[in-house]
Amino acid sequence: MAQSAERPRPYAFMTANATRPVRTRFAPSPTGFLHLGGARTALFSWAFARHHQGVFVLRIEDTDVERSTPEAVQAILDSMDWLGMQPDEGPFYQMKRMDRYAEVLAGMLEAGTAYHCYCSPEEVDAMREAARAKGLKPRYDGTWRPEPGKTLPPVPADRKPVIRFRNPIDGATSWNDMVKGPISFDNGELDDLIIARPDGTPTYNFCVVVDDWDMGITHVLRGDDHVNNTPRQINILRALGATLPEYGHVPMILGPDGEKLSKRHGAVNVMEYDAQGYLPEAMVNYLARLGWSHGDDELFTREQLVEWFDTRHLSKSASQWDPKKLNWVNAHYIKGMDDAELAGRVAPRVERRGGKPQAADLPAIMGLLKDRAETLEQLAEDAMLFCGEYQPAPAELAAQHLTETARAALADFAARARDTEWNRAAISALIKAVLADRGLKMPQLGIPLRVAVTGRAQTPAVDAVLELLGKETVLARLQAL
């Protein structure tokens, strides 16, 4: 498993011109399940690291103490494990790194790149309102920002300060985004960010910077809702004398209606797709194709994803979630899976339905059913025909199909079947013989056979169904008519 020490090993940053080993990270907040957008971001970071023989780091950003839960952490770990994205290092927990953040904050205060601000929230709100009234961008006005020759206000005796980062005023902060291309922010538009609260706890943007610095992160792939955070984080990294990572911001995933993907579009929790019977191989394939492409290839293995992955082929526009396309991809992986392996994945789902997969030839059943299935849940439900308790046909269905003519043909079939070898070819030949001798067409015997033996009018090929049920079971059910 991954390295789990809470303080990563020191990382020796190289010069900007030197080649650094690739180190990516996924840094979720454990305030709920891992959603599809987060899973896709993690997948891109994982694939990029694997492609470059680099290191994929998992960091748990758990500083929101009220909302972060151990259950949410476990849900994230379970989701990543299910998708096959095991980290090389971590998980690291921000709450266990508070001493390190305090150390860096103290150093910044000493260096003059951060300062104490004693403004109350109400005073800052008033500053912003005053700026709006003048048609300016609402922001903190720098009251407590140290400047040469500036006299600061008296320190209030009854107020604990926040710590603000002394953001550059002149110039611009720019980077060449791996997804969006060149992006630039005027430093004059960025106010002095709060990096520690009055109780001393560090804020999100500060923790992220220190973590990326300490962990030697070279490439940051994340959602484009973080674009506005990036210039602030870059400026803090520069103030610390750190080598900057490269940044890439991936557009969001939209629902089928073009709106932001949400619960109203269906499942957004990764593990719900496991419960619904989607294969992790299919989810990885489909998620990767949402916002990344390799020519016209729609289907590819995890190994091919790693081999082909390139940030130059990440889309600049939002991707649209398509449940039908996911079903198509999942069906492809189900059809291509070895019958025995597929049986192993379906067996627990059959058992949850009260079936007995061990009492049937489940691999052979998978071979019969898998070409029609889109999910493992559908396979498990269909397999209950062979593994579940037999339910005779409802009276209405029996009355419709088990006529006197049908019952006579079924009795003839049963009598001949006793001395017939029990395999699909022999059963098919027997059905044809009964049809020919009685002048019947296939539906006149095939449907009554299904209804009598399975309790259903629709099943896969009747000869295959009878073979898998076994001669003894088939004859016993026909005898009971």
Swiss-Prot record:
A motif ('KMSKS' region) lies at residues 260-264. It catalyses: tRNA(Glu) + L-glutamate + ATP = L-glutamyl-tRNA(Glu) + AMP + diphosphate. GO terms for cellular component: cytosol. It holds the Pfam family tRNA-synt_1c. Residues 139-159 are annotated as: Disordered. This is Glutamate--tRNA ligase. ATP binds at K263. GO terms for biological process: glutamyl-tRNA aminoacylation. Monomer. Its main location: cytoplasm. The keyword ATP-binding applies. Keywords: Aminoacyl-tRNA synthetase, ATP-binding, Cytoplasm, Ligase, Nucleotide-binding, Protein biosynthesis.
